[in-house]
UniProtKB/Swiss-Prot annotation:
The keyword Lipid biosynthesis does not apply. It catalyses: (2E)-4-hydroxy-3-methylbut-2-enyl diphosphate + oxidized [flavodoxin] + H2O + 2 H(+) = 2-C-methyl-D-erythritol 2,4-cyclic diphosphate + reduced [flavodoxin]. GO terms for molecular function: 4 iron, 4 sulfur cluster binding; 4-hydroxy-3-methylbut-2-en-1-yl diphosphate synthase activity (ferredoxin); 4-hydroxy-3-methylbut-2-enyl-diphosphate synthase activity (flavodoxin); iron ion binding. The keyword Iron-sulfur applies. This is 4-hydroxy-3-methylbut-2-en-1-yl diphosphate synthase (flavodoxin). It comes from Shewanella pealeana (strain ATCC 700345 / ANG-SQ1). Pfam families: GcpE (PF04551). It comes from the Bacteria. [4Fe-4S] cluster binds at C270, C273, C305, E312. The gene is ispG. Binds 1 [4Fe-4S] cluster. Pathway: Isoprenoid biosynthesis; isopentenyl diphosphate biosynthesis via DXP pathway; isopentenyl diphosphate from 1-deoxy-D-xylulose 5-phosphate: step 5/6. Its cofactor is [4Fe-4S] cluster. One of its GO terms (biological process) is isopentenyl diphosphate biosynthetic process, methylerythritol 4-phosphate pathway. Its EC number is 1.17.7.3.
Length: 371
């Protein structure tokens, strides 16, 4: 069933990255980052479009050189999704991509340079109505902070962030969001909690360098889940050493699990045991692949026997409960006379889910499909 989340989100100010609202109650935006060579325009554009196809709201692109900045110009012309330029070391690159229509600038306080350079970036951003993300990272803190704290600590990440928030405040620039990422879950979580008490600007969440697809997804789910459950977070990125498309899928899965933002089908499936009347695991895997194109939020329960099947089906849009040779089918929690042959479950259930998705899409207000 389509249920609202009980989480009360932190109040924050509103900015826009392109046409995507961030903060002040807007849907939490899911983003990823390209891992192609930015100078390979064709490959980068293809990856951006692949990310957009699986639901990305925003895509970040690394722009390490002036040659990459020139490539960014071409990339921007060939894509429609809002793009963030990731800038390190050379502030002049930020000024260049601003000319080319970048939707947001990410700068790293640990390496972007002195206040005068930041001032140049801020004045350019103000003139061109471009928001900024202050992106603090536990792996690249300023030298004086490392000398002071000896290692990355929540207080060190907070001080780095607030140092640059204060600069933007002095420059009367409020169109920014902030992140304080770390690869350690507890370090990141505590840093974000401290920061959330200090500022009203939107917060971008992430566990940086989280790891490969499996371990990184788990680490991100634990860390971001703790923060999101506290109501903290306005955008997020799942950092995986994997195909960036997987980052978007995991991001939506986390939001879906917390009922914060639902996109696509939430499969409720048993791990299976000797009581299963059909192959639950292969059924779920096949349906997940076939139904990736559905964006309508739905709960579908697929349970291999009658122990928990009927109970889960009662609170699902569509439910399947394993039976001897034929499995029971539920629609909106009501058992139907129709039963599914256990040898043809995938095709039959796919057809029912697609038909149901069309019905659900019609009864849920259009604006809620993006929540």
């Amino acid at each position: 069933m389509y249920n609202e989340s009980p989480i009360i989100r932190r109040k924050s100010s509103r900015i826009y990255v392109g046409n995507v609202p961030i903060g002040d109650g807007a849907p939490i935006a899911v983003q990823s980052m390209t891992n192609t060579r930015t100078t390979d325009v064709e490959a980068t554009v293809a990856q951006i479009k692949a990310l957009e196809n699986v639901g990305a709201d925003i895509v970040r692109v690394s722009v390490p050189t002036m040659d990459a900045a020139e490539a960014f110009k071409l990339i921007k012309q060939q894509t429609s999704i809002p793009l963030i330029a990731d800038i390190h070391f050379d502030y002049r690159i930020a000024l260049k991509v601003a000319e080319y229509g970048v939707d947001c600038l990410r700068i790293n306080p640990g390496n972007i340079g002195n206040e005068e350079r930041i001032r140049s970036v801020v004045e350019c951003a103000r003139d061109m109505n471009i928001p900024i993300r202050i992106g603090v990272n536990g792996g690249s803190l300023e030298k004086d902070l490392m000398d002071k704290y000896k290692e990355p600590t929540p207080e060190a990440l907070l001080e780095s962030a607030m140092r640059h928030v204060d600069i933007l405040d002095r420059l009367n620039f409020d169109q920014f969001k902030v992140s304080v990422k770390a690869s350690d879950v507890f370090l990141a979580v505590e840093s974000y909690r401290l920061l959330a008490k200090q500022i009203v600007q939107p917060l971008h969440l992430g566990i940086t360098e989280a790891g490969g697809a499996r371990a990184g997804s788990v680490k991100s789910a634990v860390g971001l889940g703790m923060l999101l459950a506290d109501g903290i977070g306005d955008t997020l990125r799942i950092s995986l050493a994997a195909d960036p498309v997987e980052e978007i899928k995991v991001g939506f899965d986390i939001l879906k699990s917390l009922r914060i933002r639902s996109r696509g089908i939430n499969f409720i499936a048993c791990p299976s045991c000797s009581r299963q009347e059909f192959d639950v695991i292969s059924t779920v895997n096949e349906l997940e692949q076939r139904l990736e194109d559905i964006v309508t939020p739905m709960d579908v329960s697929i349970i291999g026997c009658v122990v928990n099947g009927p109970g889960e089906a009662l609170v699902s849009d569509i439910g399947l409960t394993g039976g001897n040779r034929m499995s029971g089918y539920y629609d909106d929690g009501v058992r139907q006379k129709e039963r599914f042959d256990n040898t043809n479950i995938v095709d039959s259930l796919e057809a029912k889910i697609r038909a149901k998705a069309a019905i659900v899409a019609g009864r849920i207000p259009a604006q809620d499909l993006n929540k």
